[in-house]
UniProtKB/Swiss-Prot annotation:
It is a multi-pass membrane protein. The lineage of its organism: Bacteria, Pseudomonadati, Pseudomonadota, Alphaproteobacteria, Rickettsiales. Belongs to the complex I subunit 4 family. It comes from Rickettsia bellii (strain RML369-C). InterPro entries: NADH_Q_OxRdtase_chainM/4, NADH_UbQ_OxRdtase, ND/Mrp_TM. Coiled coil: none annotated. This is NADH-quinone oxidoreductase subunit M. The keyword Transmembrane applies. It holds the Pfam family Proton_antipo_M.
Amino acid sequence: MLELPIISITIFLPLISVLYILLFISQSKKPDKQIHTMYVAVLSSVLTFISTIYILIEFDSSNPTYQFVERYSWLDKIGLEFHVGIDGISIFFVSLTSFLTLICIIGSLFTVKKYIKEYLVCFLLMESFCIGAFTSINLLVFYLFFEVILVPMYIIIGVWGGENRIYAAVKFFLYTFFGSVFFLLSIIYIYSKIHSFDLSNIGEFTNNFPLHVQQILWWAIFIAFAIKIPMIPFHTWLPDAHVQAPTSGSVILAGILLKLGGYGFLRVLLPLLPNASQEFAIYVIWLSVIAIIYASLVALAQKDMKKMIAYSSITHMGYVTIGIFSFTDSGVSGALFQMLSHGIISSCLFLIVGTLYERLHTKEIAKYGGVASKMPVLATFFMIAMLGSVGLPGTSGFIGEFLSLLGIYKVNVIATFLAALGIILGAIYMLKLYKEVMLGEITNKEIINFRDLYIYEIISIAPLILLIIYFGLMPSSILNVFHLSVENLLVKFF
């Protein structure tokens, strides 16, 4: 294997591009500097995506430990190191981040009308910070990346969002920042006792903390990740953020940022505090079941397409948390698969809604109807994405939900049957959405002038559609990669 600092390259390439844009292109007096910025952003995202493909190709799925490990001293006095690596749990999140960022940047070139340079800079920053969070093996560095992601997303919602964008951006920031404060206090306490931030081994020490200490730390860390995922009752920021965010912002929010919550449970909470995790697991499971049913019922009542998809995200992430806290191989594997699948499906749905919004400038369901007669390609894409969201066998959405339910069935049969109701409710509201938007007669005269997808829209949506089908038909291509890492986590701590 070629010895390259490939993870550092993947993390810092977008940051270097941002510096180049700000220091050189911004100061240039040439009239084409906006086009120059676009070229740099696209090139950066392409190269970052290529580097993640290289990691995927070279990754050894038979090795459950961290690979491509890099360790550089940063602040010796407190043991702070830039310590990064990739295992089966993190590898697909890194790939998903670079893939969705590339799609968003390409799409933004045609849809963003103001401050395009700043917009692209925010997306490159988010790409760098997300990859940093998914690859960090140092707890404090993970926290720093986890926290700083707030800034570019806050700006994206607040500057390029809808009419109530400031309210949504502030609500998003305050919710997430509130949870992060408790997370930071927990990190400080842990370091004061064991003088280490190394995620690869500090669980061996924190596991020996008195149970009451573990319980307090558990709730403090749990809240931070429960807000991010989000779980009820910490969910109210998400619908507002999705409705007000621009299309690409919703793609990154649903496709990547929500996954940081589930990833945090697996990477931080469970390994650091396994005893407390087992004690409180039943509460998380029932909270997840409530979230699945509640969010599904609320989604049924929505009149805004993006808000309906936002509540469906809460439902889907509920399956993630019941899978994780089942502490079973099938449950945790299902949770990981569900996170990857949801990242693809929800991104696809938000892009589809974005194409409709670009034409009619409204997300209100009642304003549509009969769109399929004018946009058959979009209607086909929408159908596949909708069926994936419902969890139809043959799509990626089925595998994650099935494995998560299989995992929880081994723990609590009643919770399994109640959680399965979410699948039925999901089918009802998603089929209702498709029927009201795509089928029937055209009632809005503006729809008569609709033209089908442009090339750049097909380029953005088609790869996601192919992945929904491919992962649904070939789930082993994903499951085999993270199986040993999941098994290693469960055997080591549970």
